[in-house]
Amino acid sequence: MANKRIGIFGGRRGMAFYSVIAKTEGFSLCAICDEQPQMREAVKKVVGEEVQVCSTWEEMISLGLDAVILANFFHEHAAYAIRAMEMGIDVISETTAAPTLGECLDLVECCERTGRKYMLAANCPTMVGPGELMRVYRSGELGEVLYAEAEYLHPTTEAESLSLAPTETHWRRFIPGTYYNMHSLGVLMTATGLLPKRVTAMEIYTDSCRNRATVLNNKSAGSIALYQMDNGSVFRSTGWCTMSPSGKWFRLTCEGGTIETERENQDRVLLRRKGKGLMKYDPDNQYTKEEKKEGHGGADARICRQICDYLSGKVEEPLLDIYRGVTLSMAGIYGLHSILDGKTYDIPDIRNKEEREILRGDYRSPFPGKDGKWTLPFGKDRT
């Protein structure tokens, strides 16, 4: 059987997928595309001559690919995913599935129509702590989850913000706090298998936020959302918060006890069974030496293996398939709507064709378009 031909769209984040996939039997990483000349030169210094470094999407997508990894701008994944699937190419999306409700529907309908594989390759659920929460919860020993929490705090210096968002219309300057939820709500969803059905959210926007000198247009410190899940439980989750200190934290409170990651060490777990004392331990699923050579402490290596297992057919369904991935995007978008008007929003069942019809044609976006304008405020009282 011929190797699966893989292309990567976006050199900066995309190179995190190169090493592991290039070494995996049955796969040929044959193309990497980036529009920026400096990034293409940096990529060429790392990859072999057998990898074609392209300057345009059209050049890369014409190379007979079996699958493409989208590592381009956060708010542009859906459009390119649809173009790829329409050409018979499977899609791995590195970040949120879609930035608007209309594109959420367009993406799902395209995937259903074409029958292509789709995976949201969020790396946080593969990390040691979240992986142990999923293992313990799905074993059933703690019973049903009643309440859960997730925090993703990632402050940046002004120099880092300028490096990550170098242009006036860069998506990072405008992103609402609820949108970047793969590292928070995404972990709770994969650990429990549950889906959000309702959301109410508030943003953190104090006087100190308003007065902060920053290149970021959205000066909010982040957002907090409450989600009613499909089993009736309530999850509290941040999106991306710029507060200190940097870190991730997750907790599941269940009928039979609580399991959470340690705040000082997200690879360590605290387990409290009902009626018993605290058990603190390092899970068995620690990163290997080889995994630690890759990004995010080893999580990038793990998500690469999951990508290969899914594309090769070893795994039939990824942790975040098209429906779960799009639901995660909708949760963030409806969270912004809640911030803007103070209401609680129902999140449609994306599998239900009648329920999801409400999404059709709603392309309002907080991210600037080609004209430099956005069609949905990125926060309350921002015009």
Question: Which residues does each predicted region cover?
Answer:
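Beta-loop-alpha module in the N-terminal Rossmann-like domain of NAD(P)-dependent dehydrogenases
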Residues: F17, E49-C110
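Glycine- and charged-residue-rich phosphate/anionic-cofactor binding loop of Rossmann-like
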Residues: S28-L29, Y310-V326
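Short, Asp-centered acidic motifs that coordinate Mg2+ and/or phosphate
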Residues: A31, A67, Y147
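Hydrophobic residues in well-ordered beta-strands that form the structural core
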Residues: S93, Y118-L120, E149, T261
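Contiguous beta-strand/loop segments that form the cofactor/metal-binding neighborhood of enzyme cores
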Residues: Y179-R268, K293, A299-P318, G332-L336, ...
